[in-house]
Amino acid sequence: MENRMVTPFDVEDDREQYSLRPTTLKEYIGQKKVKANLDIFIKAAKKRNESLDHVLFYGPPGLGKTTLANIIANEMTGNLKVTSGPAIEKAGDLAAILTSLTDYDVLFIDEIHRLNRSIEEILYPAMEDYALDIVIGKGAAAKSIRLDLPKFTLIGATTRVGLLTSPLRDRFGMLCAMEFYTDEELMEIVVRSAAILNVNICREAAFEIGKRSRGTPRIANRLLKRVRDYCDVKHDGDIDLQGAKAALDLLEVDKEGLDKIDNKILEAIIFNFKGGPVGLETLAYFIGEELDTIEDVYEPYLIQKGFIMRTPRGRVASEKAYNHFGVTKKEEKDNQVSIFNK
């Protein structure tokens, strides 16, 4: 999965993208509702000389949660401390991070749904009262002391908000749903990134890259860099529509932003399971992918684009999925040969 050109997750080759990230809300493209709310909340907090209330970003990976955390830290003139749920293994790890913060700092916890429950409970007084409760000693001699913490902002990010416990979720003052980007928004992101990379690109080519980026800025920037490589070798370095299409076709990212694995999922449902319904476990076993990977990585985009439907009985291919392969349901029933073998 990590080697997919259209994986929404951060990979080693994406490190150059850090320089492409906006640093202010004004520079940030997309997520209009989230951006508008954050703009008001940040201005209100600064007007009252208070830290920003705690924020939870949830949604598919690659949509800008970490970027917004950086922007919030910049806007609040605080430092950003970044960690993740799996990285905090002991209560002492979290205590060390919390006591190192200063006023207006931002603590960003990625994959916050993977925090150990016992560690999670340490966050409750930290979020509510800016306090850290420490137990000294053991048994009957144990006693609890409370340390004051600076006025910091906790930003949590998760791709699976349903796995958060209610006590933790309820302590966030702002819950922000991150949505897939429109093709037009991604075009603007590609144009902006190309300018930073000193690459000449026409808007038609930028739109083509954006259209095939699965609604995800991280993928758009990754594809831009690969198209840049292609045009440096095959063209004069400038990216036009013809060069963009040729590069993306060579990368096997089709006009809908689907790659070989996406098409494999659709082919399996249509040609091997008669269009569905098929259970997620069965589908995962058939195509050789982890169940969580299908549910968290592939499905959101396929559902959002209308290729598959999630039903109580399993996954069902839509008419759009059949059209994608140029077949109708009747033709598929007349010829049940898997196109895996073609």
From Swiss-Prot:
Native species of this protein? Answer: Clostridium botulinum (strain Hall / ATCC 3502 / NCTC 13319 / Type A)
Function according to Swiss-Prot or TrEMBL: The RuvA-RuvB-RuvC complex processes Holliday junction (HJ) DNA during genetic recombination and DNA repair, while the RuvA-RuvB complex plays an important role in the rescue of blocked DNA replication forks via replication fork reversal (RFR). RuvA specifically binds to HJ cruciform DNA, conferring on it an open structure. The RuvB hexamer acts as an ATP-dependent pump, pulling dsDNA into and through the RuvAB complex. RuvB forms 2 homohexamers on either side of HJ DNA bound by 1 or 2 RuvA tetramers; 4 subunits per hexamer contact DNA at a time.
Name of the protein this chain belongs to: Holliday junction branch migration complex subunit RuvB
Chief subcellular site?
cytoplasm
Sequence segments annotated as region (Large ATPase domain (RuvB-L)): 1-181
Pfam families in the cross-refs: AAA_lid_4, RuvB_C, RuvB_N
**What does the entry note on its domains?**
Has 3 domains, the large (RuvB-L) and small ATPase (RuvB-S) domains and the C-terminal head (RuvB-H) domain. The head domain binds DNA, while the ATPase domains jointly bind ATP, ADP or are empty depending on the state of the subunit in the translocation cycle. During a single DNA translocation step the structure of each domain remains the same, but their relative positions change.
The residues that hold Mg(2+) are T66
Q: Does the keyword Protease apply?
A: no
Residues reported to bind DNA: R310, R315
Record-annotated residues binding ATP? L20, R21, G62, K65, T66, T67, E128, D129, Y130, R171, Y181, R218
